[in-house]
Amino acid sequence: MLDFYYLPGSAPCRAVQMVAEAVHVKLNLKYLDLMAGAHRSPQFTKLNPQRTIPTLVDGSLILSESRAALIYLCDQYGDEDNDWYPRDTIQRAIVNQRLFFDACVLYPRFADFYHPQVFGNAAPDGRKRLAFEKAVELLNIFLSEHEFVAGSKMTIADISLFATLATACTLGFILRPYVHVDRWYVTMVASCPGAQANVSGAKEFLTYK
């Protein structure tokens, strides 16, 4: 069983949990209370000098970036022909691009807009909201031609993006104007492994201060 240091309110943590469920990997859940400073303990700092979650431990392997963990879980534990992270080079490249879109565009813009409000009681910043909205508009374009973000089948890229948007929706972001994203989100809630835990975990984010 793999050790998994996490917080339920963390979107990247929930993405790892959903993919683990998809490939039938059991995680030994280790709740890490960041608000209490548990990530700064000597024990955790030795394990992960970045002091970040999620942190996935499989024997001597320690992964502290969620999307790297998603890829590893599929490569190491997924079936040879699993669709979560396809073996075909071109299909995999598209999945990677969508994963990096979440890592480098959507999630950072989400955090830039919402984190100051949640953790610092800041007033909403209009420019930051516009930047996040533009990222969702791009996702809407990606979803305009296919059912899922990288083609006709759900992949780890969908799961990573689903985790990010679940938190945004919990914080009041409305997907209805983005018709393709809205349609996709409904599908993810209905059919993604671990979807209900993702949605309920997103609600816990509201309690973090």
UniProtKB/Swiss-Prot annotation:
Enzyme class, UniProt record, top EC level: transferase
Listed Pfam families: GST_C, GST_N_3
One of its GO biological process terms is:
glutathione metabolic process
Q: Does the keyword Transferase apply?
A: yes
Give coiled-coil spans as residue ranges. Answer: none
* Catalysed conversion reaction: RX + glutathione = an S-substituted glutathione + a halide anion + H(+)
Detail which positions bind glutathione.
10, 51-53, 65-67
The GST C-terminal domain is annotated at 88-209
Occurrences of domain GST N-terminal (ranges): 1-81
* SUPFAM superfamilies linked to this entry: GST C-terminal domain-like, Thioredoxin-like
By its UniProt entry, which InterPro entries does this protein fall under?
Answer: Glutathione-S-Trfase_C-like, Glutathione-S-Trfase_C_sf, Glutathione_S-Trfase, Glutathione_S-Trfase_N, GST_C, Thioredoxin-like_sf
Q: Single GO molecular-function term?
A: glutathione transferase activity
Q: What EC number(s) are associated with this protein in UniProt?
A: 2.5.1.18
Oligomeric form and interacting partners: Homodimer.
Q: What does this protein do?
A: Conjugation of reduced glutathione to a wide number of exogenous and endogenous hydrophobic electrophiles.
User: Which family, according to the similarity comment?
Assistant: Belongs to the GST superfamily. Theta family.
> Protein name, please?
Glutathione S-transferase 2
Q: Where does this protein come from, organism-wise?
A: Anopheles gambiae
List the lineage, top down: Eukaryota, Metazoa, Ecdysozoa, Arthropoda, Hexapoda
